[in-house]
Amino acid sequence: MSRKKWSSLDKPPLSDAVLQVVQSFGFQQMTPVQTAAIPLLLARKDVSAEAVTGSGKTLAFLVPMLEILQRRHKETPWGPKEIGALVISPTRELARQISEVLAQFLEHEDLEHLNQQLIVGGNSIEEDIATLRRETPCILVCTPGRLEDLFQRKGDDLNLAAQVKSLEFLVLDEADRLLDLGFKTSVNNILGYLPRQRRTGLFSATQTTEVTDLIRAGLRNPVLVSVKEKASVNTPARLQNFYRIVEPELKFVALLEFLSSPATVIGKVMVFFPTCACVEYWAEALPPLLPKRTVLGIHGKMKNKRANVVEKFRNTPQAVLLCTDVLARGLDVPEIEWVVQWDPPSTASSFVHRVGRTARQGNEGNALVFLLPSEDAYVHFLKINQKVELTKLLTEEAEDADREKKKLPAVLDQLHRLQAADKGVYDKGMRAFVSHVRAYTKHECSAILRLKDLDLGKMATAYGLLQLPRMPELKNYQGGGYVAPAFEVDLSKLTYKNAQKEQVRQKKMETYEQTGSWPGQKQHKKRVESWDQTKKAKLDAKSKKELRKAKKQRKKAAEAEASRSGKGKKRQQFSQEDLDELASDIRLFKRLKKNKISEEDFDKAMGIEGNND
């Protein structure tokens, strides 16, 4: 699709205010998704747009939204209790980012009457309610959970359902992510409060069955728009995707070397890990080994700190952000030169979203995924599944591997000493490794990413663990890949640097020394049985086994006899004598269980030969 200039829109043309703000961003031409979606939305069509991440979807809905709200304001000014537009986003980071872009439009003097409010989890809901009661904003930018909560609130002198009766425009941003995060019910509930006479824009990086269902429920006769910068790829055109094969025990050293290299120091780097626990650990362990760069960590379980971390990442040159998939969608931070993935993500589509944090808005960018030797088939899998070509990172592999092997002992010593100096770091390391192993078992492409192919001892070495954790996956581990600390360490004497945690640990230690039981630890009580009960249980088990054996012998003998008499192909018929014998066997077994006959008498009656040792 050919690109058009923003000023070329003429059916209808953009207002001077909106056009001036867009041009102040430095954008002269529209991206393909903007070229396709904006005229349709301005023509009051419902639109479902699929476009690769980083393709300019935010302006594709903000621009027509502002134009539609202005038109209505000229006809009938917006009232003090009217909400004209809703923008629903899957995460608070993305919602906040949209709000920041929108704020730049609303600073224009001709758009000041279109005020907005950001409503996301993590903020005080009482403050949100107070603001909505005091001055209803024309535009709400929100996450679905908080918005649903406000719709359902009663008794707070707030009637949000009444305030959206004049709604003109609804945006469902990153719709596939909304559904992936389990917001399907919330979104459907929200749709039930909204008027049907509205325009809806649904934007998504992928079209799934769930998204199709949402389109049917929330859009009226929508126009479907599918825009890709290249028909043969699923990622931004100026993104270079690389991979590197590394041995499991060398993975952290390889990451450390990469983050220290001149190629990555010039810009920001995002490093994706599989779990929150992994981010927690490496955010503690990496900074001492990478002192020249600012290292930040963010994950989904962080509630109130996430906004501050993202803001610090934006404002810090050459920063390194360790994160989970909570930031795989929508985050638009300038100067991200590299996106690095510790290992393949749980789904192939997540790979596309992760690498889309760089090479945004037509800029260049790079992405690198570390693969183990057993994971090399992932390169072909990604090409078939997501149309993503991975190129091997051009390095002197033999020299790199040799250099990393030489650095491994020193790096491990630093990790070991970090954990030995603070039990908090030790705990985080253990949790990170266990969570990583568990996450690995849940890969979408488990046919090629198999847990049984991994040397878990070598993986534990990469984490610098002081010992291997107790977990089912390591129960029968026989490998010698794990490298223990070079110095002696008494794990029972590790202390927390956090004074409060250390105080709790010391109290538990005192209780343990007095009682022999660690406080809070689940006790597994063994059932106590008398000697007679134990003997009887063993006797019952043995008797049942012998009875099954005797019946099996009789059956074989009967089959052999039937075969000799030429009746083997007929269904076996039981005579009255056979039935009587079976009933006698059952009576004998019952008498044995009640101790009315001895085991020896039972064996003789059953014709079972004893074992002579």
Swiss-Prot record:
Coiled coil (residue ranges): 540-596
GO biological process, one term: regulation of gene expression
EC numbers on record: 3.6.4.13
Ranges of compositional bias, category Basic residues: 545-555
Motif (DEAD box): 173-176
SUPFAM superfamilies, sorted: P-loop containing nucleoside triphosphate hydrolases
Enzyme class: hydrolase
Region feature Disordered, mapped onto this chain: 505-578
Matching Pfam families: CTE_SPB4 (PF13959), CTT_SPB4 (PF23681), DEAD (PF00270), Helicase_C (PF00271)
Listed GO MF terms: ATP binding; ATP hydrolysis activity; RNA binding; RNA helicase activity
Protein name: Probable ATP-dependent RNA helicase DDX55 homolog
Taxonomic lineage from the root: Eukaryota, Metazoa, Ecdysozoa, Arthropoda, Hexapoda
